[in-house]
Amino acid sequence: FAFSNRLSTTIFYASSVLIFFIFYGIFIYLGTKKKINLKEIFILLGMTAAILVLSYPAILSYDIFNYVATSKVLFFYHENPYVIMPIEFIGDPLLAFTHAANKIALYAPFWLLLTGIPYLLGLGNFIVILFSFKLFSILFYLGSAFLIWKISRNVLSLILFSFNPLIVIETLVSGHNDIAMIFLALFSFFLLS
């Protein structure tokens, strides 16, 4: 659809980003004027996550499919994803979704072990696995928001991170793993404080 309807896709994308920035500005305003409290922020975060978990991650990136494929190499085929590429499993239906099937694992072993959680929770069903990975990203997002609050005790800091359109789109829509690294960094700061 996107390639054959570029104008519609562009308008939809630009409108979506504009809406994210409008809400971001509203939340920042409410935070600076102290017209929004912590409970309301976390309710809004939960609602945002609940809505965007249903968004299709390949709108902007195919990375989540690559995470699934790498996990499948390790946890389904029981092969070393640092040696064996997903493309070597000819006929695997997941290959139709990945755009980096010709690459070995790109991330550290700890990330691969973490991806075993959503992969195994998916019980071999592609759709369930995909949404398990998105839910995994959401948990790291909510955990990061919580840690920012615990570290800063500042509502505006929480808003600046949690409703940032880049964070929201890349985490809740695309399901990128950067949020896991953010969470772990924040967790280390939390332990130091």
Go through each PLM region and give its residues.
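Transmembrane-helix motifs of polytopic, lipid-linked glycan transferases
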Residues: F21-G31, F131-V155, I182-F183
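Membrane-water interface at transmembrane helix exits
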Residues: T32, Y56, T115, Y119, ...
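Transmembrane-helix signature of polytopic, membrane-embedded enzymes
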Residues: I36-I41, A145-I167
